[in-house]
């Protein structure tokens, strides 16, 4: 289905590209890459869900390689994108309540962008900085 494959919603390449471009845009607006977290930051459910998913990436890549199953990387990156978009729609990154929270969310956004880029690279797909 041509329309589904070009959709910015759900399981599609453009959806992943859009999520990556969104992350890069947020990081560009931050105008800094030197984020420091000095105090403990209280994490939301959405942030914890993202951290748990990020933690699984090396295992997913290893399993995908051992089983010759690139679909495992596809499933991972779609799940990651959905979790990030849910987080983004629930919490402000650049307008967080505290500087520590803002810095944590920027670091989280940077990690998500890197994992989307790494996942797509493993699948032979280049990322787009803007859409």
What are the roles of these predicted feature ranges?
Residues 1-131:
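Non-catalytic interaction-recognition regions
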């Amino acid at each position: 289905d041509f329309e589904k494959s070009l959709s910015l919603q759900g399981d599609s390449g453009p959806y992943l590209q859009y999520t990556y471009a969104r992350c890069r845009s947020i990081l560009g607006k931050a105008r800094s890459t030197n984020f420091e977290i000095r105090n403990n930051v209280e994490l939301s459910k959405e942030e914890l869900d993202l951290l748990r998913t990020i933690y699984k990436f090396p295992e997913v890549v290893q399993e995908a390689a051992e089983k010759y199953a690139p679909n495992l990387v596809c499933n991972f990156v779609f799940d990651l994108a959905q979790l990030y978009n849910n987080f983004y729609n629930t919490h402000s990154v650049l307008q967080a309540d505290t500087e520590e929270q803002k810095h944590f969310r920027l670091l989280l956004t940077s990690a998500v962008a890197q994992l989307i880029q790494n996942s797509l690279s493993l699948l032979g797909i280049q990322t787009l900085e803007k859409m």
